[in-house]
Amino acid sequence: MGPDTAWLSRKWRDELGYGSALVPRRAAMVLPALEPPRDIVVTSEKALKIDAARQLALDLFGAEVPVEGVKTVSGVPEQPVDDEALRGAHHRTEGVDAECVVSFENGLFFETVDAPEAWTAVEDYVGPRGVAVDRAAVVVVVRGTRYEGVGAGVLVPRRFAEASEASEWALTAGKAMAAAWGVPHDDWHAALVGVDRAALIRSVWWPREST
């Protein structure tokens, strides 16, 4: 049985006064029934991503699988934008030799959303390009076959997306937010909407889609 995923349909939440919102996933990753791999290599040494890969093994393969993290290069700006997130996740898998490779890359996706009349923070979030949604792009390579998806996201306050753009994407929106608000630069999502980054990553493949 999977986790409680009711939050996936709860778009608008403002309990802490930031005005941010959770936006449902963009493209689910659909994998067929597969035998568990002998090992999983994650294209990052960050503990959060290694833990996410362990959870992926349980969710998709139904088994615990040895997981190792390695340092890789994304080939995209520090703050990926739109298609750069998936491109960066794919780039990170190049040259990594394992039966299963898992790659994560967060990025800003500029999108349009249906804003409810009760949303009082419209001007703080909606700019000329729409709203900036921070989402995780995930690529999984299993025995040479590639799968990809883009998970649920969190609206990024306009000022921080614009600060990142002004730096020519060298400064991430998360680091700009951390400097202003004191939230963790790599997991500010929990502070704004009560859903942490690990859950947002997991939303790419869970609940599992039927094939």
Functional labels for PLM-detected ranges:
Residues G2-Y18:
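Helix-enriched interaction subdomains in cytosolic or periplasmic regions
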Residues A21-A98:
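N-terminal polybasic phosphate/anion-binding patch
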Residues Q79-T211:
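Anionic-ligand binding patches
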